[in-house]
Design a protein with these regions (language model features):
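Residue-level recognition of single "structural anchor" positions
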Residues: 1-329
Length: 329
């Protein structure tokens, strides 16, 4: 827009009625979202300015895409590309709304349900679900966490879930040919009065939680509760000069003995939870509470997606922002 046209536009704002002001504000917010996501995508191109087809870094500007992103033409092979070419988000038609979905996922407030977010964005719930899974696939790749000093370790548990498997539907439709699934649905224990399994069972999935006093944290789903599995998961995390604090589980004692690491066992009853004034596992207990609060609104995510949800929580705790996800895509 030319400068004199822009001044006329600003002068005309004083003639708007309240309804028109609301419409103008909504339009400006939409434009601001689009501008922000375009800036992040183009920043990604400036960091990696080589052609995704031939790898040559000689290019020239070649117009803009339908979504307003700068397009380039390779001066070597003649192919055109933009900041989204070859990225995970290359086929998203509304990158501005995708940025809103990322802010909902990684903001300070509790993430909204897929249905609530879809209503806000005016999209189908399955579109929002696919976007969420796409974002989780981007942030699931993490760097190795380095621990030092006093290291706390414990486990928390998550119910096994087959959400979306349709196995009970197929069984009810053809009970003669489709066998009954190995576990009743969790709702059947309440609605049909089935007796709940006491204590820990094979349907309780262990999640290893590790934290040190420097702020390093790790949540990792384990395939089972065997001591050997715990040892394999803990061994690469423990430096030689660390002090391991845990409960009395056998796996931790073996890890400490194998690595020659000092091991302090703390109790679970009042008066035994802190040893020598500084040895405790309150940091991982706090991590368990954060995990429970985070996972509760999802009503038990499918086990096949549990690792993605764990990484989602780690990303929120680490302060990863929406723009970091777009640049990493």
């Amino acid at each position: 827009m030319r400068q004199h046209d822009f001044r006329r536009f600003l002068n005309a704002l004083g003639d708007l009625n309240p309804a028109q002001i609301e419409q103008a504000q909504t339009k400006i917010m939409d434009l601001r979202r689009k501008t922000e996501v375009i800036s992040e995508i183009e920043a990604r191109t400036n960091q990696e300015n080589s052609c995704p087809s031939c790898g040559i870094d000689r290019r020239q500007k070649w117009g803009r895409t339908r979504t307003g992103i700068q397009r380039y033409r390779c001066q070597s092979c003649g192919k055109t590309y933009s900041g989204r070419t070859g990225s995970v988000i290359s086929r998203i038609h509304r990158p501005d709304l995708f940025l809103v979905a990322l802010r909902d996922m990684l903001g300070t407030s509790t993430p909204r349900s897929v249905r609530a977010l879809a209503r806000q964005l005016g999209l189908n719930k399955y579109t929002v679900w696919r976007w969420r899974m796409l974002a989780l696939s981007i942030i699931q790749h993490r760097e190795a966490t380095a621990f030092s000093g006093i290291i706390e370790a414990d486990e928390t548990y998550q119910r096994e879930s087959r959400k979306g498997s349709r196995e009970w539907v197929r069984h009810f439709a053809d009970p003669q040919n489709v066998p009954q699934p190995p576990r009743p649905r969790w709702e059947d224990f309440t609605t049909k009065g089935l007796k709940m399994m006491r204590g820990l069972s094979k349907w309780q999935l262990p999640i290893l939680t590790v934290a040190d006093r420097g702020g390093a944290r790790l949540l990792q789903r384990l395939p089972n509760r065997q001591s050997a599995t715990l040892e394999r998961a803990m061994e690469p995390l423990m430096p030689k000069d660390a002090v391991l604090c845990s409960d009395g589980a056998n796996g931790y004692a073996t890890v400490a003995a194998t690595g020659g690491i000092e091991h302090v066992v703390v109790g679970t009853k009042p008066g035994t939870r802190v040893t020598a004034g500084c040895y405790h596992i309150q940091n991982v207990n706090s991590l368990h509470a954060r995990y429970d609060k985070f996972i509760k609104p999802f009503c038990g995510p499918a086990t096949k997606n549990l690792n993605l949800y764990i990484r989602w929580l780690e990303a929120r705790l680490a302060g990863i922002g929406p723009t970091d996800v777009i640049r990493a895509s």
